[in-house]
Amino acid sequence: MTSTQRTLMVMAGGTGGHVFPGLAVAHRMQAQGWRVVWLGNPAGMEATLVPRHGIPMEYVHFGGLRGKGLATKFALPFNLLRACAQSLRALRRVKPDVVLGMGGYITFPAGLVTVLTGRPLVLHEQNSIAGLTNKVLAKLAKRVLVAFPGALPNAEWTGNPIRTELARTEPPQARYAARSGKLRLLVVGGSLGAAALNEVVPRALALLAPDERPQVVHQAGAKHIDTLKENYEAAGLSCGSDVALVPFIDDMASAYANADLVICRSGAMTVAEIAAVGVAALFVPFPHAVDDHQTTNAEFLAEQGAAVLVQQRDLSAELLADWLRGQSRDSLAAMAERSRSLAKPDATDEVARVCAAVAGANLEGKQ
C-alpha cells in the first residue's frame, strides 16, 4: 500500500445477495486505485469466493440468532464480545478510511466497533425490508443506502450494485422487435433448484398446444437436474431444440437478454438484474424468506406493471398455462420496457462514490 492509497473495508457475508453486490463495489474501488480488504466469516461462502477475486480477508466469528436454540441465545453475549474484539483487531490492522456494510451477521459487531472507534460507516440494504442489523446500524452510520425506496428511513435510493455486463445489454425495445417465432422462456431455479418451479412449469407447458409452447431454457442446479429431466419426461416433453435443461448458467446477462420472459424467485439481486437488463418476469417469491422480503421485492416491479407476482401457494400448472396463452411478444416487451425504466444501472458507481466521498475523496468516471 502506498502512503497516499486509500483503503475500503467491505463487511458482507452469508449469502450471495450480500456478497455479490459487495464484490461489484470492491472491484469498482480497486479500479480507482483503492486498496480493498474484506471482513467476513471463515465459515461463510465469502471465505471461498472473495479470495478468488484477489481480495484479502479478515475474519470474524459470529452467527445469527433467528431460529436458533436456547444454547445459542445464552451464548450470545460471549459470542458478541468475541466478535467485537476480533473486529477491533481487524480494524486496527487494516486501518480503513471507510467501512462499507453490505449485510450478513458479522456486520453487526463489526459495524458497532467501526462507529465506536470513530471510523466512517456506510450501510447498504439490498432488500425491500431491512434486516434487524441494518435497522440498528442505520442510526449510527454516516450514510445509509437502499436498493428499494423506503426500506430504511432517511436513506438514499441507489439501487443494488450489479455486474457491469448486466447494465450494458441492448435496450428491450430493440431486442424484442428483432425477434419472431416462438416465445423464449427462461426458468431460473438457482442453486437450490426451486422445486415448485421444477414441478409446475413442465406440467404447465404440457397443457399448451405445440404451436403455443415457448422455447424453454430451464436452470435447476446440479443436484436437481435429473429430477427436472424426469419431470419434463413425465409431462411428455423431451429435451431437444425447444427444451434445454441446464444445471448452471455462466453468462446470466446473455441468458436474460435472450429471453422474452423469465420465471424465477424474487431475491433482491434477481429483481435488480432483471430490471437492469429489461426483461419481462413472472416472480414466484420463496415463501419462507425472512420477513417475506421476496414478496415485497417483487412488488416493487409488479405494482408498476413491470412484472407479474404469483405466490407459490397459488401457482398451478393450469394457472400458469392460462396466463402464458394470454401473452404475446408485444405484451412482454411492454413489461420489459417498464422494468428497464425502474432500474438503477449505475448503482455500483453510486455506492462507490458515496464511499469515496465519506473518506474525503472523489471517484472518477463511470464503469
Curated annotation (Swiss-Prot):
Listed GO MF terms: UDP-N-acetyl-D-glucosamine:N-acetylmuramoyl-L-alanyl-D-glutamyl-meso-2,6-diaminopimelyl-D-alanyl-D-alanine-diphosphoundecaprenol 4-beta-N-acetylglucosaminlytransferase activity; undecaprenyldiphospho-muramoylpentapeptide beta-N-acetylglucosaminyltransferase activity
GO cellular component assignments: plasma membrane
Listed GO biological process terms: carbohydrate metabolic process; cell division; cell wall organization; lipid glycosylation; peptidoglycan biosynthetic process; regulation of cell shape
Binding site for UDP-N-acetyl-alpha-D-glucosamine: 15-17, 127, 163, 191, 249, 294
Compartments where found: Cell inner membrane
Keyword line: Cell cycle, Cell division, Cell inner membrane, Cell membrane, Cell shape, Cell wall biogenesis/degradation, Glycosyltransferase, Membrane, Peptidoglycan synthesis, Transferase
Involved pathway(s): Cell wall biogenesis; peptidoglycan biosynthesis
Top EC category: transferase
Disulfide bonds: none
EC number(s) per entry: 2.4.1.227
Catalytic activity: di-trans,octa-cis-undecaprenyl diphospho-N-acetyl-alpha-D-muramoyl-L-alanyl-D-glutamyl-meso-2,6-diaminopimeloyl-D-alanyl-D-alanine + UDP-N-acetyl-alpha-D-glucosamine = di-trans,octa-cis-undecaprenyl diphospho-[N-acetyl-alpha-D-glucosaminyl-(1->4)]-N-acetyl-alpha-D-muramoyl-L-alanyl-D-glutamyl-meso-2,6-diaminopimeloyl-D-alanyl-D-alanine + UDP + H(+)
Highest taxon listed in the record's lineage: Bacteria
Pfam families (UniProt xref): Glyco_tran_28_C, Glyco_transf_28
Primary localization: membrane
Record membrane topology: Peripheral membrane protein
PANTHER family linked: GLYCOSYLTRANSFERASE (PTHR21015:SF22), UDP-N-ACETYLGLUCOSAMINE--N-ACETYLMURAMYL-(PENTAPEPTIDE) PYROPHOSPHORYL-UNDECAPRENOL N-ACETYLGLUCOSAMINE TRANSFERASE 1 (PTHR21015)
Similarity section: Belongs to the glycosyltransferase 28 family. MurG subfamily.
NCBIfam families on file: murG
Function: Cell wall formation. Catalyzes the transfer of a GlcNAc subunit on undecaprenyl-pyrophosphoryl-MurNAc-pentapeptide (lipid intermediate I) to form undecaprenyl-pyrophosphoryl-MurNAc-(pentapeptide)GlcNAc (lipid intermediate II).
Protein name, UniProt field: UDP-N-acetylglucosamine--N-acetylmuramyl-(pentapeptide) pyrophosphoryl-undecaprenol N-acetylglucosamine transferase
Native organism: Burkholderia pseudomallei (strain 1710b)
